[in-house]
């Protein structure tokens, strides 16, 4: 499985082509749209979410509600594009139009300046448009397709916010996966402790008044995977490494960890490793899951627990100082439309990005031309692991 996305923040549309999805998978635009709606929710989202109501169009690879094994083409129209027809025109335009929304005041923390340097842009909008988090809408759409495959194999995914703008969420110890998923999806903050919602919302509102933004830490959990996905034989085949790269590819994500993560640096080995146990009915398992479901780049059969840290959104309504790229004079950075926080939406993006990596790994490890062969091979392997 592989895919590419294309499109700009204020361009005509976002597009993706996905190759490698097995034939015979039940798939509809409505299934994908449900996931896109999750991305657009969450407390703290701004005006664009009222402008855009993302709906995907499938133009290839699906016939009569079933995938054909051919490349799947997805398109999401940008409704906001109608206000940017001349500025984002594909055809050549007059110089006066080019100057309309030209950006020469790069925003600290964004791709504006470095992208302009790399690609020799005199208008930094070219870097801004493609590097925008708007692109993550299409990665959620791709992830939605991947999650349909995972569901057929009995694999579930969830995400929730652990730290919201410096406020740690009190997660009940040993909270079951199903409870985490249910609680987070019921919360417009994507947290599992409803008692903290009022405090966090007040914090968001105050930060918004100050023209500032908030970051945080998000946890994604994958439940139902067997032991042995991934490999230790080469560095680039380690599944946790692939997930780490994917998480860090999400806009504004600056760190990733599995299980106990960086806390392991403060512990002894006996406080970190997951003891192995065996039972005649359930096979091998672990007493704990401190390593987050991975050993040597391979799944252990425990839930995958991966955390990502998202920096505060760098577009500030109280902008930081910058420099005009034409005059080199100090200026306050350009202000583009932004939100005080996008953590709940980022959690949906992270969940779908991780789901895509997991699906890709499964499709590479098992026969995957069609869903019948995939399911037979996958469940046969799960049975083998169970009786090892």
UniProtKB/Swiss-Prot annotation:
Reduced FMN (FMNH(2)). One of its GO terms (biological process) is amino acid biosynthetic process. Pathway: Metabolic intermediate biosynthesis; chorismate biosynthesis; chorismate from D-erythrose 4-phosphate and phosphoenolpyruvate: step 7/7. The keyword Amino-acid biosynthesis applies. Its cofactor is FMNH2. NADP(+) binds at residues 39, 45. It catalyses: 5-O-(1-carboxyvinyl)-3-phosphoshikimate = chorismate + phosphate. One of its GO terms (cellular component) is cytosol. FMN binds at residues 130-132, 251-252, 296, 311-315, 337. Its EC number is 4.2.3.5. Pfam families: Chorismate_synt. Keywords: Amino-acid biosynthesis, Aromatic amino acid biosynthesis, FAD, Flavoprotein, FMN, Lyase, NADP. Belongs to the chorismate synthase family. Homotetramer. This reaction introduces a second double bond into the aromatic ring system. PANTHER family: CHORISMATE SYNTHASE. This is Chorismate synthase. It comes from Streptococcus equi subsp. zooepidemicus (strain H70). The gene is aroC.
């Amino acid at each position: 499985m592989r895919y590419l996305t294309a499109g700009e923040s204020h361009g005509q549309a976002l597009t993706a082509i996905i190759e490698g999805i097995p034939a015979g998978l039940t798939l509809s635009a409505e299934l994908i749209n449900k996931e896109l709606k999750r991305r657009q929710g969450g407390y703290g989202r701004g005006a664009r979410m009222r402008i855009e109501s993302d709906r995907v169009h499938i133009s290839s690879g699906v016939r009569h509600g079933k995938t054909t094994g051919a490349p799947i083409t997805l398109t999401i129209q940008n409704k906001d594009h109608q206000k940017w027809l001349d500025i984002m025109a594909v055809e050549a335009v007059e110089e006066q139009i080019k100057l309309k929304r030209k950006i020469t005041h790069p925003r600290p923390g964004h791709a504006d300046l470095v992208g302009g340097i790399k690609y020799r842009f005199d208008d930094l909008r070219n870097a801004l448009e493609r590097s925008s988090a708007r692109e993550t809408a299409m990665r959620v759409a791709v992830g939605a397709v991947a999650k349909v495959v995972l569901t057929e194999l009995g694999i579930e995914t969830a995400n929730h916010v652990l730290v919201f703008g410096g406020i740690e969420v009190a997660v009940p110890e040993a909270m079951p996966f199903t409870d985490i998923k249910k609680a987070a999806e019921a919360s417009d903050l994507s947290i599992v402790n409803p008692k903290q919602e009022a405090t966090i919302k007040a914090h968001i509102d105050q930060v918004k008044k100050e023209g500032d933004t908030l970051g945080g830490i998000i946890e994604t959990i994958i439940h139902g995977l067997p032991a042995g996905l991934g490999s230790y034989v080469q560095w680039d085949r380690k599944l946790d490494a692939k997930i780490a790269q994917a998480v860090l590819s999400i806009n504004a994500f600056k760190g990733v960890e599995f299980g106990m993560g960086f806390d392991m640096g403060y512990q002894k080995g006996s406080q970190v490793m997951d003891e192995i146990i065996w039972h005649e009915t359930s096979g091998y398992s672990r007493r704990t899951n401190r390593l987050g479901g991975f050993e040597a780049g391979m799944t252990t059969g425990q839930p995958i627990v991966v955390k990502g840290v998202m920096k505060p959104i760098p577009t500030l309504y109280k902008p930081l100082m910058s420099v005009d790229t034409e005059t080199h004079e100090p200026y306050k950075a350009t202000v583009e439309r932004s939100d005080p926080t996008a953590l709940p939406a980022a959690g949906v993006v992270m969940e779908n990005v991780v789901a895509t990596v997991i699906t890709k790994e499964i499709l590479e490890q098992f026969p995957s031309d069609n869903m019948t062969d995939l399911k037979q091979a996958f469940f046969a392997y799960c049975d083998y692991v169970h009786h090892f």
